[in-house]
């Protein structure tokens, strides 16, 4: 688990409890910029380490889904945020975005800037693509996304009913921009 976020096993505790000490290097070496892919770099030093060579995309999200996927964006605007509004997909750094886009440009390591499409139109969150899939079978989509998506099983089935491939973007949330 910890390796998914750039931590390395450093040593085992001396009292033989089976516990390990993990460490994470916070500053990259010059060679890391050329040796590692953008995703590997983000895993090792991120979140928030981007370079000028990465592709970036603006991603529209309908307000209600945006609020579920990124609840911190609405909590900042509330005087008394509700602490019970937490689902597994909203309480994670690794999330999934589904859409019917025909785009084939998005690749692993690309930066995604999410904005509310029918609301304020402001960019509030960014992330980095971990994996890109094009799928038609709802069960495959559910298997790939797990609990990382805001969509319920029936919504995914409806989305797939048109016979069109669904673009599945698994991404790591890097930052939510404060207001």
Predicted regions and their residues:
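Short His-Asn-centered micro-motif
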Residues: 60, 115-116, 126
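Conserved active-site/ligand-binding neighborhood in enzyme cores
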Residues: 72, 96-104
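Short coil-to-beta transition motif at edge beta-strands of beta-rich domains
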Residues: 101-116
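Short, structured beta-strand/loop micro-motifs enriched in basic residues and often containing a Trp
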Residues: 87-98
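Short gly/pro-enriched beta-turn/loop segments at secondary-structure junctions
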Residues: 52, 107-109, 122
């Amino acid at each position: 688990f910890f390796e998914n976020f750039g931590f390395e096993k450093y040593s085992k505790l001396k009292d033989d409890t089976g516990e390990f000490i993990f460490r994470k290097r916070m500053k990259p070496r010059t060679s890391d910029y050329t040796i590692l892919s953008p995703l590997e770099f983000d895993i090792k030093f991120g979140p928030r380490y981007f370079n000028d060579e990465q592709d970036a995309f603006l991603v529209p999200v309908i307000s209600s889904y945006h609020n579920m996927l990124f609840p911190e964006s609405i909590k900042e605007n509330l005087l008394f945020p509700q602490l019970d509004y937490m689902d597994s997909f909203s309480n994670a750094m690794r999330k999934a975005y589904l859409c019917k886009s025909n785009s084939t440009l998005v690749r692993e390591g690309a930066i995604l800037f999410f904005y509310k499409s029918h609301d304020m139109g402001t960019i509030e969150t960014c992330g980095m693509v971990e994996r890109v899939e094009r799928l038609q079978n709802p069960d495959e989509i559910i298997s790939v996304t797990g609990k990382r998506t805001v969509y319920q099983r029936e919504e995914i089935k409806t989305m797939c009913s048109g016979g069109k491939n669904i673009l599945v973007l698994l991404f790591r949330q890097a930052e939510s921009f404060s207001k």
